[in-house]
């Protein structure tokens, strides 16, 4: 299976996006297709054995739309430029049409040879020519509307096409009658209605497009954040090159005030670097030899040299752009409801307009009035606002979150985050800083402590666990050299197993690892002492005999007590799920205000506990991603804490770009505001249609209130802009 994100041209409303989505999902070889109206893209997963990319793009074209290719911003910008010039042309001609057709109504000077009373033929022919030009400028609307009607996926363009052509064709009929001498038809021409409907729709789409671009600002900022050039060392000399010329393994030099060009690892120098755009943390981070640096971050102080590791699309920035773009390409449950409604909406409007046309034709015997009502219904009921209500808010909220160092990978996670009933936290590296240090070693072996530590550290060097790092750091401090191993095996949730070059077999991990392998633990008094002092305990066996207990202590994260208190104030059940022993877990839990502790659990057992908790409502699991992948997937929403450079964590639907757990409460607030905004948008979209469609049907005709197509087009434009502007409030 292969995934592509195609730029789509020609979508104007929710019926377009939902119609294209349905059509693509019916095609053999396409597994899933999610179409986003705001981002103008389609996220498609297809079987490479059955389809090529060209065939997928042909499906898009058959559905009545145009594929601009993968991330083809150049074509998109060119199209926007063309639309701008078209709009200028339509505006000038539409104003001229309005002047010719309505100047006599508002007391403006009438052009003598175009006077509808004295020169009806000139008047009709001039409006015919000018309106034809406007329709040609707006032919994309007519073309899209026709294609979607043929494919049985009628959309906003279909309604406009039928309305505009009905006015235009009837006006041509009127013009023919005028040429035949029936000058009374001069008052039954609707050329201006056809032209002004296209004018207002084009104006609305242009403003809407500009505002949509504002919603993508966070992504655009990220895409332009890296420098254009960098200084690298080639053949012993400093050379300035473009980013495209940098290769993996190149040594890059970054001076104070410059931006990091590509992701890498410092090999020389010490500095402080601002990574706020990635982590949301404004305080510069200290970087030294061995520290990772991220492209786009700013070097504050010293000159550093670093080895290029991730370039181009592999970089952290590119990964973030991809994740945020993919998040906006997913559908929130609330959006699926809106799409379902819009799927029925357009056909229902078509039926209502036809019934109204027939009824008014029978009642009034006036075909001009019946056409006026028919066109007004079609134009006023365009479902633009309905289609924009959800995706606009999702795009803005995803951008807001990414600015704060929070990557939300799915719209569903964003929608449901504030609905959580329970939040489960792993302990080490999540509630604590994960910067562990050895507090005590009980050595029961015949080896010297330094020799024993050398063997243990040589094994733990191959592990990613925070406790393993503490052991390795201790060995480095003691200037101990590491040994090579014969075999190494990580046992998730238990520890590690290794065989040294001399065939000695070591087991290093928790108590369960010892029990599972039949290792007797006679020194319970020492174990209890370590527990009472708040240590996590590492058990070490050599050839199935316990040879050491190592006590490791951690430091709580800053402000963690307030984070837990805020969550509890929101009536969220907070649980600690940890593989640590009960006593140590309870000491930490008591310090930070967590009442419910589930200790001594393996990754598999964590997942089982989460399944039980899910019976009471939505469960969020927050972990460091090392041992928590199963529980992150099992939870309704998995939150992973990233190192800043490793963000491609498939198991988590939310990634915190730094280790600040306060971001959890920030995301709850973003989620809450986003859903509130979506509900407001949907309310106004439905309220508008509920009010306007009956008026367009002529229910107020008896009291002298009627809606003509020009007013309908203006009202429809205002309705869409109301939704857009309301969504943009989320940026504040």
Predicted regions mapped to residue ranges:
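Flexible metal-binding regulatory segments at protein termini and peripheral loops
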Residues: 1-122, 212, 237, 318, ...
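Juxtamembrane coupling segments of multi-pass membrane pumps/enzymes
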Residues: 5, 192-256, 287, 337, ...
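Conserved ATP-binding TGD loop and adjacent catalytic N/P-domain core of P-type ATPases
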Residues: 18, 330, 499-503, 534-536, ...
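Conserved cytosolic catalytic loops of P-type ATPases
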Residues: 28-46, 54, 189-191, 220-314, ...
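Soluble-to-membrane junctions at the N-terminal ends of transmembrane alpha-helices
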Residues: 74-93, 144-167, 321-354, 374, ...
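Transmembrane helix-loop-helix hairpins at the membrane interface
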Residues: 82-229, 340
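ATP-driven catalytic headpiece of P-type ATPases
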Residues: 85, 297, 418-464, 494-575, ...
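Membrane-embedded alpha-helical bundles of multi-pass transporters
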Residues: 106-118, 150, 169, 400, ...
């Amino acid at each position: 299976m292969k995934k592509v994100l195609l730029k789509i041209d020609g979508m104007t409303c929710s019926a377009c996006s939902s119609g294209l989505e349905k059509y693509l999902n019916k095609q053999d070889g396409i597994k899933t297709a999610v179409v986003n109206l705001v981002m103008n893209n389609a996220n498609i997963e297809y079987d490479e054995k059955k389809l090529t990319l060209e065939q997928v793009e042909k499906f898009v074209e058959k559905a009545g739309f145009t594929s601009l290719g993968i991330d083809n911003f150049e074509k998109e910008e060119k199209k926007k430029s063309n639309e701008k010039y078209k709009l200028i042309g339509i505006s000038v001609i539409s104003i001229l049409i309005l002047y010719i057709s309505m100047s006599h109504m508002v007391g403006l000077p009438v052009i003598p040879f175009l006077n509808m009373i004295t020169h009806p033929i000139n008047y009709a022919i001039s409006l015919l020519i000018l309106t034809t030009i406007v329709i040609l400028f707006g032919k994309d609307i007519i073309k899209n509307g026709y294609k979607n009607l043929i494919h049985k996926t009628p959309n906003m363009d279909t309604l406009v096409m039928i309305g505009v052509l009905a006015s235009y064709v009837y006006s041509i009929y009127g013009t023919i009658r005028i040429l035949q001498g029936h000058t009374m038809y001069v008052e039954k021409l609707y050329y201006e209605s056809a032209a002004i409907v296209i004018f207002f729709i084009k104006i609305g789409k242009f403003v809407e497009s500009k505002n949509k671009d504002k919603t993508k600002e966070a992504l655009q900022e990220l895409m332009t954040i890296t420098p254009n050039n960098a200084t690298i060392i080639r053949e012993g000399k400093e050379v300035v090159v473009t980013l495209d010329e940098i290769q993996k393994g190149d040594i890059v030099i970054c001076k104070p005030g410059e931006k990091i060009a590509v992701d890498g690892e410092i090999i020389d120098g010490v500095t402080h670097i601002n990574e706020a755009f990635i982590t949301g943390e404004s305080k510069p981070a200290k970087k030294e030899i061995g520290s990772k640096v991220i492209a786009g971050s700013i070097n504050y102080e010293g000159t550093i040299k670093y080895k290029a590791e991730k370039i181009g699309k592999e970089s952290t920035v590119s990964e973030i752009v991809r994740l945020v773009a993919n998040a906006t390409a997913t559908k929130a449950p609330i959006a699926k409801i809106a799409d379902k409604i819009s799927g029925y909406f357009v056909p229902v409007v078509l039926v209502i307009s036809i019934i109204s046309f027939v009824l008014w034709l029978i009642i009034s015997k006036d075909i001009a009035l019946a056409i006026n009502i028919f066109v007004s219904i079609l134009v006023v009921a365009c479902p633009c606002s309905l289609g924009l209500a959800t995706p606009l808010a999702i795009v803005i909220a995803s951008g807001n979150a990414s600015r704060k160092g929070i990557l939300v990978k799915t719209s569903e996670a964003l929608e449901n985050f504030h609905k959580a009933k329970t939040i489960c936290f792993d302990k080490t590296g999540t509630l604590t800083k994960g910067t562990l240090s050895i507090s005590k070693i009980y050595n029961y072996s015949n080896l010297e402590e330094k020799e024993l530590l050398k063997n243990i550290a040589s094994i733990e060097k191959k592990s990613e666990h925070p406790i393993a790092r503490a052991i390795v750091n201790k060995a480095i401090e003691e200037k101990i050299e590491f040994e090579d191993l014969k075999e190494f095996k990580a046992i998730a949730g238990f520890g590690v197993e290794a065989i040294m070059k001399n065939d000695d077999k070591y087991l290093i991990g928790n108590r369960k690892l010892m029990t599972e392998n039949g290792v007797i633990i006679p020194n319970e008094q020492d174990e209890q002492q370590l527990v009472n002092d708040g240590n996590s305990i590492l058990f070490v066996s050599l050839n199935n005999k316990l040879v050491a207990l190592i006590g490791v202590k951690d430091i709580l994260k800053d402000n963690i007590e307030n984070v837990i208190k805020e969550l509890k104030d929101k009536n969220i059940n907070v649980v600690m799920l940890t593989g640590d022993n009960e006593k140590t877990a309870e000491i930490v839990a008591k310090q930070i205000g967590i009442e419910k502790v589930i200790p001594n659990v393996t990754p598999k057992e964590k997942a089982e506990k989460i399944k039980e908790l899910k019976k009471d409502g939505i469960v969020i699991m927050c972990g460091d991603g090392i041992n928590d992948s199963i529980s992150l997937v099992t939870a309704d929403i998995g939150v992973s804490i990233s190192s800043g450079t490793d963000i491609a964590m498939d198991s988590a639907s939310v990634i915190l770009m730094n280790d600040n757990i306060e971001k959890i409460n920030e995301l709850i607030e973003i989620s809450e505001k986003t859903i509130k905004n979506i509900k407001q948008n949907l309310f106004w979209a439905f309220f508008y249609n509920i009010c306007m469609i009956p008026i367009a049907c002529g229910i107020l005709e008896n009291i002298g209130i009627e809606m003509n197509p020009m007013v309908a087009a203006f009202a429809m434009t205002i309705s869409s802009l109301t939704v857009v502007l309301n969504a943009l409030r989320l940026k504040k």
